[in-house]
Amino acid sequence: RWKDSALMLEGEGVRSMTALFLQMWSVLQEPEFEQFLRPEVPAARAEGFVVPYGDCPLDGERVGEMVYIDLLNRARKYVHIITPYLILDGELETALRFAAERGVDVHLILPGKPDKWFAYALAKTHYKALLSSGVKISEWTPGFTHAKVVIADGVEAVAGTINLDYRSLYHHFENAVWMRGTDCIANMEADFQDTLIRCRRVERTKESIWQGKKLLHLAGILLKFIAPLV
């Protein structure tokens, strides 16, 4: 089975997302932007704030990672994350661990059945350190979850294309939407809890992490040396 998530955006934010796409496209050529930017359509009145943003690998700014780290550093109750990949650099791993160590409920849901065995192996190499700091990890047993969702304290959330791996955080063009106080945040948290019902909770033991897959364990150790390229 395959699980994903989607966010419907209306109003001025749509124009911002279009501009982000055109900015990426302009790396290859310089189109006439205005012909693609449709006149703004007034959106229905809604609560909260929505900020679309993008991350470009050519400018040296790690916007996607900084947003995630900021949410982790400011959270007081919980940070719930669904991500298909987990290949962390030192900064993001430290932020996840520190948030858990100061009492925040940091809980990650990852796929129970991978689409890429090497990414799956590398993800598991992070489990022991994260679990040791109190981070909770669950694997969605029905199949592969492709959603990229972060919910913090039921007040803020991010949904978009940005995985917790080097490709998304350093090498790819990505985009996402940061939200605060919007109605859909409660729906996102409800979906997280519903997804959790069909997950296997990973414990801090070698057997629970690797499930007896010795070749996968060995592959994870070896691939660690080239993790930034995977």
Predicted feature locations:
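Charged, low-complexity intrinsically disordered terminal segments
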Residues: 1-230
